[in-house]
């Protein structure tokens, strides 16, 4: 997939989320703070900071002697973040509008790096983790969240694409979709003491809500490609009909269960400087 086109898709997707904050998004993100110990005076990087949920909480813990840098690709999300930071009268957060892949911080710059629910969006996750390792000070830590490969109704769409159209639709969560995959990626980058905590955020959907999770269109924002764009209208219609029928088959008295298994992952850089 063309990288610049993909990044424009991501930016547009998040620019449309003008009311991002709610109980779900807040509670999901804020739990990252509990994954690592923060101290007064730390320098923190919050990757894909969004509306600064994590950045604000971290800034309040590290105090005025500390600093948080929040990076996000979406100007609309950063506008919401700026309003919240101003309202909270916080002065130790700097926001940067940028693709994190285009930034290059000095080695040993940060005590902690956070990233809430955004790692799967990155085009080269091993490279991203290697960068984070370099940017961290010796003894520094990272904390990020991601979802299991069984989360949401995505596996159903992927299965039907293979079964009906013989195409391999990439699952957004597949690269980091198990605790073992997360641990392997981090250890490859040099991290140690990897901890993966698992939590279930799933809920029941109505049949109509479940059907609307995929509208039968060609939209599929994924760094590993989008084979839906090559399908004919006839194929898309057939695929959508099969998806809706499968949803109806899965219905129970409570509705359609949408699994949302989230991993809260933390790890450390070795406490001595690498040569």
Mark where each language-model region is:
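Conserved catalytic/acceptor-binding region of the Class I
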Residues: 126, 141-206, 225-228
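C-terminal helical/coil "lid" or tail adjacent to the Rossmann-like core of SAM-dependent
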Residues: 2-3, 9-14, 195-254
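A short acidic, Gly/Pro-enriched loop at the edge of an enzyme's catalytic core
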Residues: 101-113
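Core SAM-dependent methyltransferase catalytic element
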Residues: 190, 214-215, 261-275
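Short glycine-dipeptide loop
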Residues: 64-65, 136-141
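Class I SAM-dependent methyltransferase SAM/SAH-binding core
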Residues: 43-103
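Conserved class I S-adenosyl-L-methionine
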Residues: 1-42, 53-57, 77-80, 88, ...
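A short SAM/SAH-binding and catalytic strip from SAM-dependent methyltransferases
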Residues: 112-125, 148
């Amino acid at each position: 997939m063309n990288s610049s086109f993909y990044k424009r898709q991501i930016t547009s997707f998040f620019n449309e989320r003008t009311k991002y904050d709610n109980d779900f998004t807040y509670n999901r993100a804020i739990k990252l703070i509990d994954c690592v110990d923060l101290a007064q005076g730390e320098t923190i990087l919050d990757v894909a900071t969004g509306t600064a949920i994590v950045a604000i909480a971290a800034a309040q813990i590290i105090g005025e002697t500390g600093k948080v840098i929040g990076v996000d690709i979406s100007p609309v999300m950063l506008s919401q973040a700026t309003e919240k930071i101003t309202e909270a009268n916080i002065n130790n957060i700097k926001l940067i509008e940028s693709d994190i892949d285009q930034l290059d911080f000095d080695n040993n710059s940060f005590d902690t790096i956070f990233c809430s629910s955004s790692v799967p969006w990155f085009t080269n996750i091993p490279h991203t983790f290697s960068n984070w390792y370099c940017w961290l000070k010796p003894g520094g830590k990272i904390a990020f969240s991601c979802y299991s490969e069984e989360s949401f109704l995505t596996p159903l769409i992927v299965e039907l694409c293979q079964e009906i159209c013989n195409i391999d639709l990439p699952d957004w969560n597949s690269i980091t979709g198990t605790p073992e995959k997360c641990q392997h990626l981090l250890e490859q980058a040099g991290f140690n003491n990897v901890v993966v905590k698992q939590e279930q955020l799933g809920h029941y959907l109505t049949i109509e809500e479940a059907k609307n999770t995929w509208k039968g269109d060609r939209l599929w924002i994924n760094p590993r490609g989008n084979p839906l764009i090559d399908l004919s209208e006839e194929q898309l219609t057939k695929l959508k009909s099969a998806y809706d029928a499968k949803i109806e088959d899965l219905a129970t008295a409570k509705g359609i269960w949408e699994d949302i298994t989230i991993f809260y992952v933390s790890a450390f850089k070795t406490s001595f400087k690498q040569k």
